[in-house]
């Protein structure tokens, strides 16, 4: 919306790539390569004369002086859009992060991928049955879309995709356990879809533990209110918190640190600053808090760009209204759940819709083509091609 204007636009990011996060779990589970879902930011924006990209990190925001402070410099702004997303929340137990990585970045995905593959390699050469079982047990904490998709993908890896390559253990020796503190997984989905997802996971060999809170995590496993689960591979998908940079705005936030924004997505008292996406706490006209999903951020981005482009004064700005285009989650090969405009889909049809939507929203023909080929190859052969351990 702003590329055909006289505005000078500066995009600041601490990574040099745009990441398609919905498929990040497939990098973590060796289905795709990082380059399949990431594109250099500069290559995306090189054709726009008024956009400058800076590879840096914003440390704080001085809203009184209209300054964004970077690691070793600062930038003036007339308008500021803060779209910094969210990070993992370990609910005050930051020491768990080293043991139980979350999934937000490509680095996270590669760490998880190597943990999974390395666990299988270590199990292959282990003579102690008890220790071997720890290597063959994979625990995912959190039953939201990320946790469900990870659990399904790891189950396919451990019980189908890679199991033929190992001789010391059988598919039934592996355990995939999904832990959820609430009474059902996919709590933001329709209850019937949630139940279907649980049923599909269990058919794939995933043990789903509901109403189970994690008390602590150690190198040897997970302690829950129901007992101890011995495991060497633990993945965190249970909570998010806002970026600490938002604290420098000195405005009201929710418990997760998200900025409580005005109905035009601006910061109270500073109509020139907008906070969108996972960084924002926004209630719709019914008092419902908007979810932290990509379609919310995309719609808010376009909305805010329109306000800036048309230089609409604060008192005349329209109210942002979110249009829900549906929710979906994949569970495994030919297994998914989806709800689109009230229509509920499951199984193969939901999986086909999920596949089409995700390929469609990938940036670039090359990425779309490569992902389609990888998926077709896996569908026909049940084998993933990106199983390297490179961090050792």
Residue spans of the language-model regions?
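A Rossmann-like FAD-binding core segment of flavoenzymes
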Residues: 49-60, 155-263, 269
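C-terminal, flexible cofactor-proximal segment of oxidoreductases
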Residues: 305-392
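Rossmann-like dinucleotide-binding core of oxidoreductases
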Residues: 132-189, 196, 207-209, 292-308, ...
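Beta1-alpha1 glycine-rich phosphate/pyrophosphate-binding loop at the start
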Residues: 1-54, 59, 138, 145-188, ...
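FAD-site-proximal beta/loop scaffold in flavoenzymes
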Residues: 98-128, 220-223, 228-299, 306
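Short glycine-rich anion-binding loops that position phosphate/pyrophosphate groups of nucleotides
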Residues: 85-88, 151, 240-242
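FAD-binding core/adjacent interface of flavoenzyme oxidoreductases
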Residues: 51-141, 224, 235
């Amino acid at each position: 919306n702003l590329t055909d204007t006289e505005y000078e636009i500066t995009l600041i990011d601490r990574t040099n790539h745009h990441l398609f996060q919905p498929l990040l779990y497939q990098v973590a589970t060796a289905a795709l390569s990082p380059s399949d879902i990431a594109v250099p930011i500069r290559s995306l924006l090189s054709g726009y004369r008024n956009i400058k990209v800076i590879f840096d990190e914003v440390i704080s925001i001085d809203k009184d002086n209209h300054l964004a402070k970077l690691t070793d410099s600062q930038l003036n702004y007339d308008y500021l859009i803060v779209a910094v997303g969210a990070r993992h929340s370990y609910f005050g137990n930051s020491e768990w992060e080293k043991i139980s990585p979350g999934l937000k970045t490509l680095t996270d995905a590669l760490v998880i991928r190597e943990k999974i593959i390395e666990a299988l390699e270590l199990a292959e050469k282990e003579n102690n049955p008890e220790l071997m079982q720890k290597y063959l047990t994979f625990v995912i904490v959190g039953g939201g879309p990320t946790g469900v998709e990870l659990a399904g993908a790891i189950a396919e890896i451990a019980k189908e995709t890679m199991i033929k390559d190992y001789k010391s253990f059988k598919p039934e020796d592996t355990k995939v356990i999904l832990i959820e503190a609430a009474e059902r997984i996919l709590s933001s989905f329709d209850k019937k879809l949630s139940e279907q997802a649980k049923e599909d996971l269990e058919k794939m060999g995933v043990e789903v533990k509901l109403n189970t809170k994690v008390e602590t995590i150690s190198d040897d496993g997970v302690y829950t209110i129901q007992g101890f689960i011995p495991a060497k591979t633990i993945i965190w998908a249970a909570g998010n918190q806002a970026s600490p940079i938002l604290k420098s705005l000195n405005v009201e936030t929710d418990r997760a640190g998200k900025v409580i924004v005005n109905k035009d997505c601006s910061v109270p008292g500073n109509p020139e600053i907008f906070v969108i996406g996972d960084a924002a706490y926004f209630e719709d006209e019914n008092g419902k808090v908007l979810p932290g999903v990509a379609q919310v951020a995309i719609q808010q981005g376009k909305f805010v760009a329109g306000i800036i482009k048309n230089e609409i004064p604060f008192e005349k700005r329209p109210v942002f209204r979110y249009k829900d285009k549906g929710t979906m989650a994949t569970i495994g090969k030919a297994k998914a759940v989806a709800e689109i405009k009230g229509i509920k889909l499951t199984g193969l049809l939901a999986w086909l819709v999920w596949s089409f939507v995700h390929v469609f929203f990938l940036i670039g023909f090359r990425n779309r083509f490569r992902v389609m080929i990888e998926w077709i190859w896996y569908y026909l052969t049940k084998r993933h091609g990106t199983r390297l351990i490179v961090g050792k």
